[in-house]
Curated annotation (Swiss-Prot):
Every Protein kinase domain range: 389-662
CDD domains xref list: PDZ_MAST3, STKc_MAST
Family according to the record: Belongs to the protein kinase superfamily. AGC Ser/Thr protein kinase family.
Compositional bias per record (Polar residues), positions renumbered to this chain: 110-121
Biased composition (Basic residues): 1066-1081, 1184-1194
Active site: 512
Sequence positions that bind ATP: 395-403, 418
The name this protein goes by in its record: Microtubule-associated serine/threonine-protein kinase 3
Amino acid sequence: MKSRREKLLIPALTLDLSPSSQSPCLLSPGSPCSPCSPSLGLQPWSCRSGNRKSLVVGTPSPTLSRPLSPLSVPTAGNSPLDSPRNFSAAAAISFPFARRADGRRWSLASLPSSGYGTNTPSSTVSSSSSSRERLHQLPFQPTADELRFLSKHFRSSESVVDEDGGRSPRLRPRSRSLSPGRTSGTFDNEIVMMNHVYRERFPKATAQMEGRLQDFLAAFAPGDRLALADGVLGFIHHQIVELARDCLAKSGEALVTSRYFLEMQDKLERLLQDAHERSDSAEVGFIVQLVRKLLIIISRPARLLECLEFDPEEFYHLLEAAEGQAREDQGVKTDLPRYIIRQLGLAKDPLEEIQPLNDLDESQPPAPGSPESRGLGGPSRRKPCESDFETIKLISNGAYGAVYLVRHRDTRQRFAIKKINKQNLILRNQIQQVFVERDILTFAENPFVVGMFCSFETRRHLCMVMEYVEGGDCATLLKNMGPLPVDMARMYFAETVLALEYLHNYGIVHRDLKPDNLLITSLGHIKLTDFGLSKIGLMSMATNLYEGHIEKDAREFVDKQVCGTPEYIAPEVIFRQGYGKPVDWWAMGVILYEFLVGCVPFFGDTPEELFGQVVSDEIMWPEGDEALPLDAQDLITRLLRQSPMDRLGTGGTHEVKQHPFFLALDWAGLLRHKAEFVPQLEAEDDTSYFDTRSERYRHLGSEDDETNDEESSTEIPQFSSCSHRFSKVYSSSEFLAVQPTPTFAERSFSEDREDGWGQSLGDRGRRLSADLRLRSWTPASSCQPSSCQTDRGPSPSLLSTISLDVMPKFAFSSEDEGASSGPADPQKPVFILGEPDPPPPTTPVTPKPCNLSADTAVLSHARLRSNSTGARHSTPRPLDAGRGRRLGGSRDPGPEKPRASPGGSGGRVPKSASVSALSLIITADDGSGGPLMSPLSPRSLSSNPSSRDSSPSRDPSPVCGSLRPPIVIHSSGKKYGFSLRAIRVYMGDSDVYTVHHVVWSVEEGSPAQEAGLRAGDLITHINGESVLGLVHMDVVELLLKSGNKISLRTTALENTSIKVGPARKNVAKGRMARRSKRSRRRETQDRRKSLFKRISKPSSVLHTSRSFSSGLQHSLSSSESLPGSPTHSLSPSPTTPCRSPAPDAPTDTASPPNVSPSSSSPASPATGHTRPSSLHGLAAKLGPPRHKSGRRKSTSSIPPSPLACPPVPTPPPRSPSPLPGHIPIPARSPRLRRGQSADKLGLGTSERLDGDGGRRARGAEAELVVMRRLHLSERRDSFKKQEAVQEVSFDEEPGPPRGVPKIAVQGAEATPGTPGHARKD
């Protein structure tokens, strides 16, 4: 019977019958001698074996008619030289294996060492030698003995003893066999076997690839280099690095295969295609080079594994399918192999790739920044800026900033602009996270994810322009509507699942899923937003579906801090274990429960209690009429599994989509489904569906006022970007095409002129700033920053005053500092991110006492502006005059005393002394003040602004004493070579003290000693930030965040008014002087609310905001402080005038209510306004059970967790409630009464006065603690993204000091009795 190929007259194989060939040769595109290389066309080849005959196809199937390799066939006496002329399927099935010692396969290594498919004249001899070895496949499943033999066989260079005692091979002038047989064994076994052979045969290739991948990751990791300006390219950069990291991990685990490399190449090509299609930036060239470099790194191992894993059977299957498809579609009748080779891209003209290189000068895009690149693509289009948008109204406030509704001035299109405070980001080391959020929002193109159009920066804010979603968020909907109907909850949940599926496919873990971040569109559909805590991991790959991959993916990220919102945090995050995509599915389970029930399943009065319920408690289900459907209950139960391995969704989104709860849901038609709730907008600018949260966050004042302080003008490079969708919308806009892009200095000084600066000063500053920028971007600037100082012309202090281009001196991480400490690359632009630090002085510079230094006078105009309220500070006239002379070029070193206002009630108080020096002139009987009004005088008990203030350059005060230049310590490791100690400095004979830090010892030969640091000096500033009044833990934190470079300002103790004395006996009665700041403009009662909650005893309930972050160290919260450590302030906050409790100071009756700095005793003042405090430090493990204070609980609803306390003014003090003190609470039930809104649920809770606070009021004839419960809606805010504001002002009548009980808090504070106590007179 003739075969199908003979009927079609199409040869199955092309045989080489040319006269130059001694025998016919099989030509297959997959064989080593096939024309796999473009340099080989269809030309005569030399044969592989001089004795091998041609193959005659006699069976219908090509896969059964061809052996897997040139094996010896059990015919004609088992001769290895016989041709399988009579080969059949039956013979192939019953084919016996040869002896174990002969278990070799035909070798690809018979080719020359350089490659694959290279034809050489010696191939005939090599093939003859290969044929004489009677090569066979390896056994089906090798035993342990066989594996040992194979290991010896592949590793040894000696010949193996045959079973008959002979040596096999006797003559082997080439390398050994590469691979075992391709049998139908299990997939995992084949991968292990193949990688074993690969690593044994090619150890250098493996080591070379892993080494290059490590260098690749070290050089191009996103955190170690300047971020890309384009958000899409930034996200692609993240993914390329993640692919390289995953390849390195797979190689170390011996899990790489040719299929893995093939998919990796496909992913890289897709990312490169996205870069070309969705970005117009010149930075695409960087992505192209990055992809090309990674492909070169993996090319050699990929080719080797492809040769090792070549499967003829699979290839013939594909070949047969290609033949049939070609016959059906295109009617190919002749020369089928040539067609297949052409379709596979194996016969390309090699000149095709070289041809574009001839026109390189014409076709290649010019380098970024060149004049040619500016004119590329038509008229130049500048990036958007703040002036392009007009603000309509506030949408919502947040921890780091606010969201506003804006309108584009040219197109009149509405957007939502998110303004994030720069200083808050810098002080919390969150700059990189903002770039991640920008990249995700820019790259994401999904109907259920909010998209971003552009980003830019102003002097004080980073701005992201996003699409405006009109319908508010689901949290507000739950607050107003109560539990949602099942169908409505199903649709919202399903649309969120689709958004999550899209994000997870690109390796994005949201980490902060909650109803607040689910926005409702004008058509009633869901859009996911707020990626401020998100992580970018590895995108989904089919080859990662191996055994154990789920467990590895569930531990993809490991953080040293707990991030998220307490009620939605998964157990693995609480335990500080590795986490991954399953944390989002846990949050989805909590969200669905909240949708259907109306409250979260886990709650508590403290974070510890809440987390204890999360990791241990059972879920409470509603009963009776409010019972949930069984399928919904089952879905929630499976989503809230404690183990991430057992959680629904861990194996993929399809697990959730296939649940019976969505049985009747059309996943493909969700957007076409009519929503039950459609927002009804009264006007275009209607934002009534949003909660502004103005009672919790006060950003309004700071948004309106722009001051002249240089520290607020920090430029974060590469943040401004324009997405592809924005480019398409405004590509034809003349407004964006014509106007030039203002520089950062121009934007800054235009705002300065609006604030009242002179025109001449602005012009001069702009010229200086432009000159500084030009010098900074010169490629030839390869000197150290300190050595470049003299080449800049003006003095550093003048540049720091006028130029707004420089980066302020903050405590950056080590990787941020490391980039600027070493010499710059002369071939790359030099990015000067900070003012150059002067070299360590050889001789100490000691100005005359009572004189203002040049730095003090120059920086005097840089007024502190609060990031929370933005009240404007005034500038004393003498300092303004001095500033004007110095800006004009005069450097008169003569003494100059500022005119301070009299110490009356109407006089202004200087803001702080954190820049120039630390004024310690405290006199107990100085009640009227003097010409040198000190911040620590009895008129103003104010140590300094917040320890996390937005500006390290604060207002100077007149100082008597010497202030040394900054001491810059460079350390190659983590050791600076000095130790410090916290001391108490008492004010006069009172029990009020502040905490200072002195250098306790300096090691010999250490970097600190070389920099000029001396033991016994008082530390005033660390990296430009004042440490006056900071607790020891915060000072250590500032040091640890500095990396390998730290800048200290110190002064000798003998130059201050601090007198060292014996330790006090009654140290428990001491009270800390608390930090406070005064408001600049509005001093009404509502702007002077106290921001500290009250607690009755150390074990009482800790009220915190719902959003907090926990690091490795334990930070003190507002109610946990040592007797010797002041409670610290964590962020810039509105200032409050406060008075001194010194015995001689008169009582100010107009001051705010009395608030004790760390009130823990029943006798301390207790009334005041409450505001959310920050739980910045959470114990690394859950501590022992805390004793709850007696509080009456509501029986009508579930007690919400007080994790966010809005600063609503508390009612005036009144008598204790006559209601019974302790009402036993019944069994906890999560049911909420549907007819009762969240406002009603919280009604009356703010007026409960009994419990612990009530007992205090009745028993001690003291103040009254007002504890209030929180509404359910007030418990939703991010852990990490919150305004950590803590400040207090108190005014206390003269009287005996009250004791402060000790609270056990971990830390290294100076304890009572140590020789670190001092007294200030």
